[in-house]
Amino acid sequence: MKHLQKKNSKNPKKIEEKYNTRNSYFILYDRALVWLTLGLFSVGLIMVISTSIPISQKIYHNPLFFIKREIFYFFLIFLLSFIFLRTPIIFWEKNSNIILIISIVLLVLVLLIGHSIHGSFRWINIGFLHIQPSEICKISSFCYLASYLSRKSNEVRNNFWGFFKPMSVIITQSMLLLAEPDLGTVVVLFFTTISVLFLSGAKIGQFFIIITVSILTIILLILLEPYRIKRVLSFWNPWEDPFGNGYQLTQSLIALGRGNFLGQGLGNSIQKLDYLPDAHSDFIFSIIGEELGYIGSFLILLIIFTISFRAMYIGQKALEKKQIFSGFLACSIGIWLSFQTSINVGSVTGILPTKGLTLPFISYGGSSLIINSIAIFFLLRIDFETRLKTSQAFPRGPK
């Protein structure tokens, strides 16, 4: 009996220790980031449901076509979370070169066997899945850049060739992306890479050369392609040709104008009824403005930029703990998400020419949604490892 009592008396302590361990691991995850992301996912799903029914019925004679695919993507993201949240960041640092090579191979393959939509070869079809290599290219580039800076940060600061090496990788990817063509992703890659190199302490003179060459290249690319010239001219004054090159932008502006401050109400958009092209993907923000108004649009942008600033904060904390790869990866994710959001919103409001970029976490698109989710998993894992390192630095005293 005494033996049984002793055995049973130890069990509660073991159970308590197990509970405390699991609970502490949960606390070590950034719960604010989790809830913000889940909130955006919910808004994105609701808006895809609202915007995709008309076009699903018209093209596929099934009003739930895009909705079913979106739900499948969320289920896939849920499964991927078990892998990425449990994988140490050091794994991605060690294999960053392999991931980069895979993404470049995919960029080559999409030009050879890719599926064309609106004249752009951006998708590889594998069964019912449509893989967009340009989305994979973003996260692979930032993993490579962070890995390079963790090894060669002094070389980047003191040597032009150390600065130019990561830029040469981006240039190689950009040439393949422009062949699709996908100028929007090229702009995002260049801006994010230059911003992260600036954070690493690279000299201003090095940026001057790269930025000058980049601007001249973009101008040349616009002048060489007639459709890009038309895009720039239609963005400059879309009302000059409202039923031609300026059609999409004028319909987008009409949607935003109809929304006013409070919006027409969820599901009450008129522009999504086959007036505004890509209402469920690149131009979903216009329908958000129409249905939820300026206030709803502002709140959604506030959440996205809060996530971006949170990423920068996580990166700063990691760098303070000498976790160089983690720090630069988190910073690159924050810059990428905020810059891509700015370009998307600028395009649908007529501030910038259209670039074919999605609104992160909101627009329909499996590759975009999955890659954005993986970026969040990276942030959560980086924050987890940083907090774990901090907690281990302060050992508990004897009980």
From Swiss-Prot:
Membrane topology, as annotated: Multi-pass membrane protein
Superkingdom to which the source organism belongs: Bacteria
Main location: membrane
Cellular localisation: Cell inner membrane
Catalytic activity, as annotated: [GlcNAc-(1->4)-Mur2Ac(oyl-L-Ala-gamma-D-Glu-L-Lys-D-Ala-D-Ala)](n)-di-trans,octa-cis-undecaprenyl diphosphate + beta-D-GlcNAc-(1->4)-Mur2Ac(oyl-L-Ala-gamma-D-Glu-L-Lys-D-Ala-D-Ala)-di-trans,octa-cis-undecaprenyl diphosphate = [GlcNAc-(1->4)-Mur2Ac(oyl-L-Ala-gamma-D-Glu-L-Lys-D-Ala-D-Ala)](n+1)-di-trans,octa-cis-undecaprenyl diphosphate + di-trans,octa-cis-undecaprenyl diphosphate + H(+)
Keywords: Cell cycle, Cell division, Cell inner membrane, Cell membrane, Cell shape, Cell wall biogenesis/degradation, Glycosyltransferase, Membrane, Peptidoglycan synthesis, Transferase, Transmembrane, Transmembrane helix
Listed GO CC annotations: cell division site; plasma membrane
EC number assigned by the record: 2.4.99.28
InterPro entries (UniProt xref): Cell_cycle_FtsW-rel_CS, FtsW, FtsW/RodA
Family label: Belongs to the SEDS family. FtsW subfamily.
Function of the molecule: Peptidoglycan polymerase that is essential for cell division.
Protein name: Probable peptidoglycan glycosyltransferase FtsW
Name of encoding gene: ftsW
